[in-house]
């Protein structure tokens, strides 16, 4: 349902990331980066670096300065481990072992698999549900919004830049808001389309304001997390209440309830903040991996519910 719905306790983690991390504040790290740039990132040394840099690295946007940061990160980590200290974070992230040009291999692959799961279920929904179903177009729009979010999540975990970070965060917010809209259409909009239209316009206005503030005023990690958590909790509560009220009449709502509970439970994985296993697999990657089957469950619910609504609307048409 919502791509990044997390408990309120995560707010403290998000705020902590905004001010930098222990690793990148270390004088040894900063001095290492400075010396590396002076030695390798200007004049003939820079030309030599570019000539020996693999083409896939340059196409992915890896610069000499980026390579200096990467090498100095591992140099600093090595010193920490030698002295028996805990592995530090750098720029709000744990140190990850780069694979080819992929910055966070496990999270990137998991995001890609989530996207593929969404694509498979989108195709299945499209093949099994006629376009005449009352929820067809709303569900298809939600599927495309989700697919777009997982695309940018894959790009962001492959290469972390200001642009890819913003696109990942903004598209995640769009999924959460669209899930709320989907719930509104299903629970209210089928009987009162004007209410759903007005509510959709309000959500679009909220998303526009959210993106404008983060882009033009201040990219506040704490505020972004707070906004997503607040909307995510509204989303989960709305779906859960509706499912509980209709579970006897609509047995397929049980899948939706399972998704709601799973999302809330799996989000707790984000609290297990630990250095990546084998420098690849951290809690965030495990969370991404664990959400893959959730797409299947939720789209199965959407498919069953859309077919039920189609059957119900057909029966009403015959009665008329």
Curated annotation (Swiss-Prot):
Residues 1-23 form the signal peptide. Pfam families: Per1. Residues 120-135, 191-198, 245-257, 300-320 are cytoplasmic. The chain crosses the membrane at residues 99-119, 136-156, 170-190, 199-219, 224-244, 258-278, 280-299. Glycans are attached at residue 40. It is a multi-pass membrane protein. Its EC number is 3.1.1.-. One of its GO terms (biological process) is GPI anchor biosynthetic process. It is found in: Golgi apparatus membrane. Residues 24-98, 157-169, 220-223, 279 are lumenal. One of its GO terms (molecular function) is hydrolase activity, acting on ester bonds. It comes from the Eukaryota. Keywords: Glycoprotein, Golgi apparatus, GPI-anchor biosynthesis, Hydrolase, Membrane, Signal, Transmembrane, Transmembrane helix. InterPro entries: Per1-like (IPR007217). One of its GO terms (cellular component) is endoplasmic reticulum membrane. Belongs to the PGAP3 family. Involved in the fatty acid remodeling steps of GPI-anchor maturation where the unsaturated acyl chain at sn-2 of inositol phosphate is replaced by a saturated stearoyl chain. May catalyze the first step of the fatty acid remodeling, by removing the unsaturated acyl chain at sn-2 of inositol phosphate, generating a lyso-GPI intermediate. The fatty acid remodeling steps is critical for the integration of GPI-APs into lipid rafts. This is GPI-specific phospholipase A2-like PGAP3. It comes from Mus musculus.
């Amino acid at each position: 349902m919502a791509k990044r719905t997390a408990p309120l306790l995560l707010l403290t983690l998000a705020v902590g990331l905004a001010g930098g991390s222990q690793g990148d504040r270390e004088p040894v790290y900063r001095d290492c980066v400075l010396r590396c740039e002076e030695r390798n990132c200007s004049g003939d040394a820079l030309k030599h670096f570019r000539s020996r840099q693999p083409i896939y690295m340059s196409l992915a946007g890896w610069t000499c300065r980026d390579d200096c940061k990467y090498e100095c990160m591992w140099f600093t980590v090595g010193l920490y481990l030698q002295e028996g200290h805990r592995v530090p974070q750098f720029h709000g992230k744990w140190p990850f072992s780069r694979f080819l040009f992929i910055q966070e291999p496990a999270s990137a692959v998991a995001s890609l698999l989530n996207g593929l799961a969404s694509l498979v279920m989108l195709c299945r929904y499209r093949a099994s549900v006629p376009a005449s179903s009352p929820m067809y177009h709303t569900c298809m729009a939600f599927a495309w919004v989700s697919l777009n979010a997982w695309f940018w999540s894959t790009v962001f975990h492959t290469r972390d830049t200001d642009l890819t970070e913003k696109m990942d965060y903004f598209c995640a917010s769009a999924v959460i808001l669209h899930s709320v809209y989907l719930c509104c259409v299903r629970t209210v909009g089928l009987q009162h389309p004007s209410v759903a239209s007005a509510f959709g316009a309000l959500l679009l206005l909220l998303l526009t304001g959210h993106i404008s503030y983060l882009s033009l005023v201040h990219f506040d990690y704490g505020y972004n997390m707070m906004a997503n958590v607040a909307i995510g909790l509204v989303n989960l509560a709305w779906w859960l209440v509706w499912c509980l009220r209709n579970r006897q009449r609509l047995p397929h709502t049980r899948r939706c309830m399972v998704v709601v509970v799973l999302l809330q439970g799996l989000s707790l994985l984000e609290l297990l903040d630990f250095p990546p296993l084998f420098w690849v697999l951290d809690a965030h990657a495990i969370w991404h991996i664990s959400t893959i089957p959730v797409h299947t469950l939720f789209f199965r619910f959407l498919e069953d519910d859309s077919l039920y609504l189609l059957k119900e609307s057909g029966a009403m048409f015959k009665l008329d």
